[in-house]
Amino acid sequence: MKSPHKVIYCYLIILYKLSSCHIYYKYIPFRLTVLVNYFLLLNVGEIMWKKLESLTSKIYEKARKRKGEHRIALLIDGPNMLRKEFNIDLDKIREVLSEFGDIVIGRVYLNQYASDKLIEAVINQGFEPKISAGDVDVEMAVDATELVFNPNIDTIAYVTRDADFLPAIRKAKERGKKVIVIGAEPGFSTALQNIADYVIKIGEEFQLDREKLEKKKKNKFLKVEEKQKDKEETENREEP
């Protein structure tokens, strides 16, 4: 789609050319008026275009929310979860989360001792490896907090058993984000499970078929959305 200021530009160029003809040449104010109008209309056209883009974006956002689609940021605590005893399949995690929405960010946090083979496997499965020389939890928590303020993300999924992420999760929920936690026993923090909107335990939900997972998702995860919707409707009724 052509932006309106381009159409205005073409129209005014024609007027300007006409003003160059001998029949209008003596009317210098006419030419000046064309130039002034060009710059004025160009700015107006730019403003109108931006407003149209903003309106279109809002309409799309509302339609997306009605359908229950989520834009998910997936953060995986590598040292805590990518262990032989858990035998985690990153593709399976992606498949399970696809039931909730689209994964727009997928990161695997690793320490400096991660093998080249593991890093290569993470990349080959379409995830972004983030290698830290320090505490992996700190870097992951910092990124998680930044995502709380990202308007393009409405759901944050953690793959971890660690309660260190509770502050970041609380902040996310305060800002209206949904939180999914994927973990495994032993050592899966009870506090982490209680604060999440939806919990997936590796070894349980990962063995469920698609129909059962969909049923569990609707029964628990989407109830949070219904409560949020009721809250918004109540606030709208209270407005004068």
UniProtKB/Swiss-Prot annotation:
Gene3D superfamilies: 5'-nuclease
Pfam family, one: NYN
InterPro entries listed in its UniProt record: CHP00288, NYN
Entry's Gene Ontology molecular function annotations: RNA nuclease activity
PANTHER family: HTH OST-TYPE DOMAIN-CONTAINING PROTEIN, SLR1870 PROTEIN
Name of protein: Uncharacterized protein MJ0482
